[in-house]
Amino acid sequence: MTKTLIIAEKPSVALDISRALGGFTRKGDYFESDDFVLASSIGHLLSLVAPNDPVRGKWSFTHLPVIPPQFDLGPVDKRSTERLKLLVRLLKRKDVSAIINACDAGREGELIFRYIVQYAGVKKPIQRLWLRSMTRTAIREAFEQLRDDETMQPLADAARSRAEADWLIGINGTRAMTAFNSKDGGFFKTPVGRVQTPTLTIVAEREERIRSFVARDYWEVHATFVAAAGLYEGRWFDPAFVRNESDPEQRDSRLWSETAARTIVTACEGQPGEVEEESRPSRQMSPALFDLTSLQREANSRFGYSAKTTLSLAQALYERHKVLTYPRTDSRYLPEDTVAVVRETMQQLAGADAGTATPLQPFAATVVEQQWVKPNRRIFDNRKVSDHFAIIPTLQLPKELSEAEARIYTLVARRFLSVFFPAAEFRVTTRITRVAGHHFKTEGKVLVEPGWLAIYGREAQGEDAHLVAVAPDEHVRTEDVELRGLQTRPPARFTEATLLSAMEGAGKLVDDEALREAMSERGLGTPATRAAIIEGLLNEGYLRREGRELIPSAKTRQLMTLLSGLGVNELTSPELTGEWEHKLKQIEQRELDRSSFMRDIAQMTQVIVKRAKEYDGDTVPGDYATLTTPCPKCGGVVKENYRRYACTNCDFSISKYPGGRTFETAEAETLLEKRELGPLTGFISKQGRPFAAVLRISDEHKLEFDFGQNDDADSEAVDFSGKESLGPCPKCGAAVYEHGMNYVCEKSVGPERSCTFRSGKVILQQEISAEQMRKLLAEGRTDLLTDFVSSRTHRKFKAFLVRQSDGKVGFEFEPRATKTAAKKTGAKKAAAKKAATKKTARKKAAPAESEADVLD
């Protein structure tokens, strides 16, 4: 008897499928029934294999471009290798005669599955399971509507094409730019990519507008008028104003001359006014249902959540709790045949026990009672549903959500309810008061019927202006006229919310109508990838977070200058993404051959590499700074060029990116002034390892790294007088001070050293502030520090630094949360295990010495 192998994308999905279909027995990491074998991937198991990374040295132009005749696959990591062995064995079982692709419905899910089958080298009939919800009913219904492999082939072709094109541009572009930047020695990794670089360009261009912005003074005139019923205010405006596209700072209420503004004040003071008033009804519909990008924007604006955090929370609500539909969607509409399911969902939310959604129960009950769920193109529209529909609650009610999960669920549930509520109704009043030939405008907006705004309470209503009444033909008196001097403001920096909007609407920056239409559906990246793109730019040091703002680094300015100077405009313009999305859509619709698309990508790759390889200028043209700090060697003027800060009067110069870390201009100024800077993180050794160091300008005016581990220097007497002690040494009780890259006991330096205590100011890329060292010395433990990076796995981790019994500094980790046990004995075991784990962690904490990764 033959069986069908089902491959899901994640173990949790495989478990849900086994429960929905029933009859399965678990066999280790897979399930089996009379008819099916059920296993899963763990996300992306395979990726396109890159050429060997350099161990020492640098990427060069010698082997570029890299355009393989065929793309090889390799496991992503060791864990992937083990899972692949299982899947290959199951795929090659003789009793497995067919395969069902149950990976996530979309391009990436298709790619994950196709790579696994390709790697296994099997050819068996394939069918496609297209899941839009993880409820058992939805899973069973999807199994009754399996799609054939021929139908899915265009999506598979588009998925492969996207992956291979991204690989070609990313690998070759990154290595070409890295080779160019590493010509003078060292290894300056310069990542570029089809989506990440245009995204970075958007932020860089905004920052340039902010940097070059010059504030302009302007004036407004505000007046207070007396009517029989009371006071009201108005603002002067020019009724003849015409918007000037070349000067967007112009407004009908702005006066650019103080003299002209004062003339209006003088003319209107104490004068009578005539009133003209128009009052009209206004309706405000609720926003559309959430797709992933709009949900990420809302969560960032309301709670400060990063796009990555929101995606993780929404994914957990979909997979683990099963209370939301598939989150990685770019549609804000529902299929027309889901009206009945939506009614049922609304009835669930209206029930007596709606779990986390209980506060919304009265609103859901109103929708049910009024029968507001009915066909409506604002909500149900097949033409606007892509692979997946909008994010909405499922028939399963939420229980035991974390605070963050509950916030995201409530956002979605409220939006879901609001689209079925009537529009909010306002009474909008515009009053024009004419005084001495001048016009003043007063506007009021009064909420008449809250409609959907009732679901949000006061959150969405704001402060409505209730205007005092003015009788017909009543004259008012000008009681007070105020002149306000103001200044124009620069554009706001991007937050994740506004950058997501810019990425989504990047098609507006494209001139070609067909490409703009292609990008109107996806923009830069997809809802599923935008969070990772932003995180990637942060991790590569191109962006940094300050509060909620995203600020480009000096490394970004360096990259923008390079790409502009080399003429590689394909990587900075969203038109490249627009063109690709247009063609990938054509592939999905069988309107374009995959091989034709890949030929075009190969040609583009060759052009990008050629421009970087053949550029023969000494520098790259750009907008460079002149430093205010004089040359430390001769006192001359120091100017920036593409590669260095160089004196215009002598031979002094320093690299702009020692150890692969780009100087901020302010850092260069400090280094020249004080001849010392740091400790700084973000350097990369020739072995590709991150390290921290102090930078110094030597007596010979050369730039040097100081790792704080020079025994010769420590053998000299050190004068700590005038310095503040951070606390007592945990080994000998003497005072601990800051000294170079370390915190040291005063008795651990000098010719008569008697103590060995020292602890790095940077440990595994985590900066240890003086405040935290004081806390460690006084209390025995720091606060929880969140930016350690493992030298083995290169992953971030959190830990406390603790004072050990031998006086050394070690790690202590947060105890892992244990799951609530069903039985009392289980709970006791879990508690015992937790206590033992914590005890072991304290006992076996490894010394946390600073990493010294010298560049020789």
Give the ranges of each region predicted by the language model.
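Intrinsically disordered, low-complexity regulatory segments
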Residues: 1-171, 247, 251, 479, ...
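Amphipathic alpha-helical transducer elements in NTP-driven molecular machines
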Residues: 11-18, 35-42, 61, 77-88, ...
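C-terminal or mid-to-C-terminal helical accessory/interaction module adjacent to the motor/catalytic core
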Residues: 138-223, 280
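C-terminal accessory/connector segments of nucleic-acid motor ATPases
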Residues: 213-236, 271-313, 495, 514-521
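Metal- or metallocofactor-binding catalytic centers and their adjacent structured scaffolds
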Residues: 245-290
